[in-house]
Amino acid sequence: MNFEVLYQDNNARCGVFNFNQEIIETPVFMPVGTYGAVKSISTEEIKNTGSRIILSNAFHLYFRPGLEIIKLHGNLHNFMNWSGPILTDSGGFQVFSLSRFCKINEEGVIFQNHIDGKKTFLTPKISMKIQSDLGSNIVMIFDQCIEYNQNWEKTKNAMERSLYWAKKSRIYFDSYKNKNSLFGIIHGGIYPSLRDISLQELIKIDFDGYALGGLAVGEPKIEMYKLLDHICPQIPKNKPRYLMGVGKPEDLIEGVRRGVDMFDCVIPTRNARNGHLFVTNGVIKIRNKKYKKDLSCLDNTCACYTCRYYSRSYLHHLDACNEILGARLNTIHNLHYYQTLMSNIRNSIKNNTFEQFSLNFYKQKNKIDF
């Protein structure tokens, strides 16, 4: 993977990834396909929304269907029929959030897995092997995630352990001699001084990109934005910056404003399944009775399949009947909205009009939210 910044408007950046001749423009939003599938839609439909890179979770795929099944197909790309790049999360967050039992030592984590309750040992070495077997284009290091608002000492200990695991991840990743990329993850909770130490030590190890972890876990938005203001300027300018798990539309705007290049989040797909649909002027809650006889499309500025062929009335009906087609059409629309937003952001950076674009975005937003 090669990465290059081509345009800059203040701190907002527009660049390109080159994955073996496949070009991905940044800033980029990655739909989440935890189990090798973006919920309710096919890979062809994912592409038609404008999505070019997706995220899957190595932790979940390790347990279901298991590496043996995926390797029968060659790799995760073949298994799910996706020709584009895939980023895999190592599973650090899931180990700490899903396990009923979790014991940490310097080598890794012993936990009770959520599938069959068996005790499992996961280490940086095992995580790198899993992601190598999956054929991930971007591999994330194995890290320790902690809850928001932990005290300084607990946060420092977790950050230092993540750094130790980062070094181990680098060693084991390099041993596979593949051409994929490895990203480090900056930790340190809400403490800027710990974030500084984490980043500087990760830079010494030298990763292909740097992710900001441990955010969107309950902290006020203003704290997240302050941390981005603090840490993004310190990340090497020639390396991509990835804000993990953050993805409300306004978060994309504010992340890009501060120099972030990559995002992922379940919000567009999860909200779609709950009937919350993003449009130019805000959010439509399609199960509201007022849409029962509404013959208009969701958004007359949207060119997605859903808006071209279906009315709000029909989408309201599908939601009321809990029809699977409703989740599919809603997901197509929300992902198309997100990818159109990212495309417009990129164009505004190229034209040095990002600030005006963001002002217009906020002026239009929240005119409807019902």
Swiss-Prot record:
Catalytic function, reaction form: 7-aminomethyl-7-carbaguanine + guanosine(34) in tRNA = 7-aminomethyl-7-carbaguanosine(34) in tRNA + guanine
Taxonomy, superkingdom: Bacteria
Keywords per UniProt: Glycosyltransferase, Metal-binding, Queuosine biosynthesis, Transferase, tRNA processing, Zinc
InterPro entries reported for this sequence: ArchSynthase1/Queuine_TRR (IPR050076), TGT (IPR004803), TGT-like_sf (IPR036511), tRNA_ribo_trans-like (IPR002616)
Residue positions binding Zn(2+): 302, 304, 307, 333
UniProt cross-references to Gene3D superfamilies, sorted A to Z: Queuine tRNA-ribosyltransferase-like
Any one GO molecular function term: metal ion binding
Residues in the signal sequence: none
Active site, per annotation: 89, 264
Cofactor binding, per record: Binds 1 zinc ion per subunit.
EC number: 2.4.2.29
Residue sites binding substrate per the record: 89-93, 143, 214
PANTHER family: QUEUINE TRNA-RIBOSYLTRANSFERASE
Entry-linked HAMAP family: Q_tRNA_Tgt
UniProt-recorded name of the protein: Queuine tRNA-ribosyltransferase
Protein source organism: Buchnera aphidicola subsp. Acyrthosiphon pisum (strain Tuc7)
Lineage: Bacteria, Pseudomonadati, Pseudomonadota, Gammaproteobacteria, Enterobacterales
Name of the gene: tgt
